[in-house]
UniProtKB/Swiss-Prot annotation:
Protein name, as recorded: Glutamate racemase
UniProt-listed PANTHER family: GLUTAMATE RACEMASE
Reported function: Provides the (R)-glutamate required for cell wall biosynthesis.
Catalytic reaction(s) noted: L-glutamate = D-glutamate
Binding site for substrate: D12, S13, Y44, G45, N76, T77, T187, H188
Keyword Isomerase in record: yes
A GO molecular function held by the record: glutamate racemase activity
Phylogenetic classification of the source organism: Bacteria, Bacillati, Bacillota, Clostridia, Eubacteriales
Length: 256
């Protein structure tokens, strides 16, 4: 059996990476995917770097036993904590991470602040500091840590009064006319894009899933393992939380 038919592993601290999986299925319809959410240990964003690194390696080892041909770390926090070490250890497969989509936000050239919504750990990591330094001469970039938001989404709260209240409280210090763009620096956050938009109105909201999947496509091509068959690929969803509710939520968010 050709390696091209082997699945692509997509991992996250919970259900957030489903937003990246969704984009991957759209752009790469003939690929097989295995998604693993580590909801038992979510959220990663309030843990130490070492803890996140260890959890990430544990998940990757599980997927390698299922013969994945490529790995997508669809979690900004895990990317910040472990991507270099993962690439160093698993040199035989492409390893793709995700980072906040600052570049497209800056390229909009809109007046006002670019607000980066992310977990506390992502925003405190050197990797993000370097990314911010690259663009802060062109734009005013504001870090907005969002502790508690991942937990709400993991509980299936992606709309309604509770979510609106959380977001309104987060945005209360900012004037809408003074915001150039929101950058969603966590793969969970695209699932509340509609709720953010209902408060922020015409402010662009950008996430990194499209760029990540384009990079995945380039790497599959480079390694000559891109599946260009005619049969639609299969998707398997796994979660460390052995709970039907979390699997149901995962499928609902995938919304295929």
């Amino acid at each position: 059996m050709s390696v091209k038919n082997n699945p692509i592993g997509v991992i996250d601290s919970g259900v957030g990476g489903i937003s990246v999986l969704k984009e991957a299925v759209k752009q790469l319809p003939y690929e097989n995917f295995i998604y693993y959410g580590d909801s038992k240990n979510a959220p990663y964003g309030i843990k130490s770097v070492d803890e996140v690194r260890n959890l990430t390696f544990n998940v990757v080892e599980k997927l390698l036993k299922l013969n994945i041909k490529a790995l997508v770390v669809a979690c900004n926090t895990a990317t910040s904590a472990a991507i270099d070490e993962l690439r160093e250890k698993y040199k035989n497969i492409p390893v793709i991470g995700i980072e906040p989509a600052l570049k497209p936000a800056v390229e909009l050239k809109r007046r006002g602040k670019i607000i980066i919504m992310a977990t506390p750990m992502t925003l405190s990591e050197v990797k993000f500091k370097n990314l911010m330094e690259k663009y802060e001469k062109d734009s005013e970039i504001v870090k907005l840590p969002c502790p508690g938001l991942v937990e709400l989404i993991e509980d299936g709260i992606v709309e309604g009064e509770k979510m609106q209240e959380y977001l309104r409280n987060k945005f209360k210090d900012y004037e809408k006319d003074d915001i150039a763009a929101f950058v969603l620096g966590c793969t969970h956050y695209p699932f509340v894009k509609k709720e953010i938009a209902s408060i922020a109105r015409d402010v662009p909201i950008i996430d990194g899933s499209q760029g990540t999947v384009m990079q995945l496509k380039r790497k599959l091509d480079k390694y000559d393992i891109l599946n260009i068959g005619s049969e639609k690929g299969k998707i398997k969803i796994m979660n460390s939380l052995k709970d039907d509710k979390i699997l149901d939520l995962s499928h609902r968010l995938l919304d295929l």
